[in-house]
Structures are given as C-alpha cells and as structure tokens.
UniProtKB/Swiss-Prot annotation:
It comes from the Bacteria. To B.subtilis LplA. This is Uncharacterized protein in butB 5'region. It holds the Pfam family SBP_bac_1.
Length: 256
C-alpha cells in the first residue's frame, strides 16, 4: 500500500523526479533554494538549512510535520537502541590492567562530565536543571570532545549531551520538538540487544541494498509494482527467510 501511494505521488510530480538519486546535500540545496516544499532532514542540519533558506527568502518559515498516523489513526516512530561502538584492549598489551583502570577513571563522575562538556562556569552552565554551552569557549575547546569518550554514564550522558544541541537556537528547537513529538509512540528494534546472529550478519547488508534499490524502482515506476511478489520471493531466497527464522528463534528464547 505504501509503495502504491508513493508511486502515485511520483507520477503526479509531487515527489521530486530526481528523488532516487538525490544525496542529502542535494535535498538540502533544493529545499533551501525554494525548489522543494517538504523534505526529510536530520536535526543536526537544521541550523545550516534554515540559514541558507533565510538567505534565499528572508520571509520563509519552517515547521516540523508530526509523525504521520496509519489508517487506524496510530502514529509510531522507529528507534534504534543497539550498541554502536565499544572499546577493546588487545590481549597482548603489556599494561592491560592499567588500561582498564584508566578507562574506569574516565567514568568517575567529576572526570566524565569534564571530558563530555567541560567545566561548569567555564564551558557550560546549568539553567533550570538543563546544561547549556558557554560560547565560544565550548566550541573552541570541546567541539570534538565526544571523540575522547571511551564509555558513557548512560543515565547522565543524555542530559549532558544536550548542551551540544543548545549551541544554536534553531538546532535546539528542532531537536526538542522532534523528541516531544516522539513521546509515547517510540518502537524499539526488538533485536537491539541481540548478540551477533550468523544468518543476519551474513545477509543483512546485501539484502538492505537490494530492498532499497527495489523500493526506489517501484516508487519511480522503473519496475512495475506488479513485480513486488517476485522481489519478495528473491529477498526470501537470498537470505531473508533464513534471517527471519534466526531472528524469531533468538527472540523466542530471549523472552524466556
């Protein structure tokens, strides 16, 4: 149903005809120059996009569209909650124990907050219980501070980190509204905390690309929607069925 709807919009010219080949930068360029009315953007691009738009049209205004509802009237948004990186210490290291002690020291509360957002009163300040950057010192000395983290306090870091989105009023407004709109409708990936699953590790990357390429063809009409069942059959045969089975088996056992 979604592909049929998107294909209809594409045929009617309501979706950019270059959508299948647009890059993020190209989409921003089209929106900020007034060639596109709506586009999907990451909150971290909000400040620069708004600035470029205002330069081309000083009277232009932007707004965030709330998460769309399905035909039953329910809205939802997908949230990733998986581990994206971790630190390792080689087994052959001469000072393994000292390395672990160093990592632990960096997570001590006073050390961690200073590494993350600097010193209070010098790099950041607290207003109404929220952390705000002191500019320009915060940018000058801590703009790349997150690159020095080797672990996080998962309870405190989300609050500390928001000092980074408060560097720019537009960026802050977008970030806060997007998160406000997502309250109560977030759906977490059920495989977020799963260990590596062989069939998924083997097939996911190639099938993700196959799926994306196929969806773009269906939307643009270069491949007729009548071929959807053929796409699904090939997706299953090329590893999709094995991935689904392995994921369901892990989930069933993980719930016990």
């Amino acid at each position: 149903e979604f592909l049929t709807y998107m294909n209809k919009l594409y045929k009617e010219g309501l979706i950019d005809q270059e959508m299948p080949i647009n890059t993020s930068a190209k989409a921003i360029e089209k929106f900020s120059s007034g060639k596109a009315a709506i586009f999907k953007q990451a909150y971290w691009n909000a400040g620069t996009t708004e600035k470029a738009l205002k330069k081309n049209d000083p009277n232009a205004k932007t707004a965030i569209i709330p998460y769309l509802k399905d035909k039953s009237g329910k809205a939802s948004t997908f949230v990733k909650a998986n581990t994206t990186w971790f630190v390792t210490i080689p087994k052959v290291s001469k000072h393994k124990e000292d390395a672990v002690k160093f990592l632990d020291l960096k997570l001590k509360p006073d050390n961690f907050i200073e590494i993350a957002i600097g010193k209070q009163g010098e790099h950041h300040e607290i207003k109404d219980g929220k952390y705000y950057p002191i500019l320009p010192k915060f940018n000058d000395e801590l703009n790349n501070g997150s690159g020095f983290l080797t672990g996080v306090d998962y309870k405190k870091y989300p609050d500390y980190w928001q000092a980074r989105v408060r560097k720019d009023p537009v960026l802050q407004a977008f970030f806060e509204e997007i998160n406000k709109n997502a309250q109560g409708i977030m759906v977490t990936d059920p495989l977020a905390k799963a260990p590596p699953i062989a069939d998924i590790s083997k097939n996911k990357q190639k099938l993700d690309k196959f799926q994306t390429d196929s969806m773009l063809k269906f939307i643009s009409g270069s491949d007729p929607l009548a071929n959807y069942d053929q796409f699904l059959t090939k997706w299953k045969a090329d590893g999709g069925e094995a991935m689904t089975k392995a994921a369901n088996e892990w989930f069933k056992n993980a719930k016990k």
